[in-house]
Design a protein with these regions (language model features):
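C-terminal region of N-terminal signal peptides and the immediate post-cleavage residues
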Residues: 3-33
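Non-catalytic, glycine-rich low-complexity segments
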Residues: 32-42
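Contiguous beta-strand segments within globular domains
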Residues: 41-54, 61
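Short beta-strand segments and strand-loop junctions that repeat across beta-rich extracellular domains
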Residues: 62-84, 117-125
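Solvent-exposed serine/threonine-rich low-complexity stretches and specific carbohydrate-binding patches
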Residues: 79-98
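Signal that preferentially marks extracellular ectodomain short beta-strand elements
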Residues: 98-114
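Extended, solvent-exposed regions of the mature portions of secreted/cell-surface glycoproteins
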Residues: 111-116, 122-133
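Short beta-strand elements
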Residues: 128-160
Length: 160
């Protein structure tokens, strides 16, 4: 029986995808946490901004808090959206493997000739026994199209 397990492990190592969906990936989210804008003002939902997050396995249950920041041209920096830009804390997983999740926000579209520049600010926590065992803070960035459902942006620009 042990030789069967060794042969299955050898086949899985030599032939990518040999076990199809039977074997979960080592980390569905990758080795490092990431966040990306995966929805940006689509025609079917004007003003919608979606943030997708990938969170690796870790020491405890996985929690995320996604917030939206807008670019304030007057100050030359991003600031938290005052209303409607906090998704609250969401539990994503047990910590045993990498997970993905996210939140979609809805904002009023700007007046003609104006624009909103938005990005996600994400706090990730791994929790065990009522305490935080690890914390990370990241902002959205591009480069995760395959993980984020086809769209991966650092920011969302909504202009009219």
């Amino acid at each position: 029986m042990a030789w069967i397990a060794r042969h299955i492990a050898l086949i899985a190592a030599l032939v990518p995808g040999a076990l199809g969906g039977l074997a979960p990936p080592a980390s569905a989210a990758g080795a490092s946490p990431w966040a990306s804008v995966n929805v940006c003002d689509p025609p079917t939902a004007p003003g919608a901004v979606g943030v997708r997050v990938g969170m690796p396995a870790g020491p405890g249950t996985q929690w995320i808090r996604v917030r939206i920041e807008y670019y304030a041209a007057a100050g030359g920096r991003y600031v938290p959206a005052a209303a409607g830009g906090d998704g609250g804390w969401t539990r994503l997983g047990t910590g045993a493997m990498g997970v993905r999740g996210g939140t979609t926000f809805h904002f009023d579209v700007p007046a003609a000739g104006h624009q909103l520049i938005l990005r996600g600010a994400v706090t990730l926590e791994w929790r065990r026994g009522g305490r935080t065992t690890r914390r990370a803070r990241i902002h959205t960035h591009a480069g995760h199209a395959a993980d984020a459902g086809g769209t991966s942006l650092a920011q969302c620009v909504i202009r009219r």
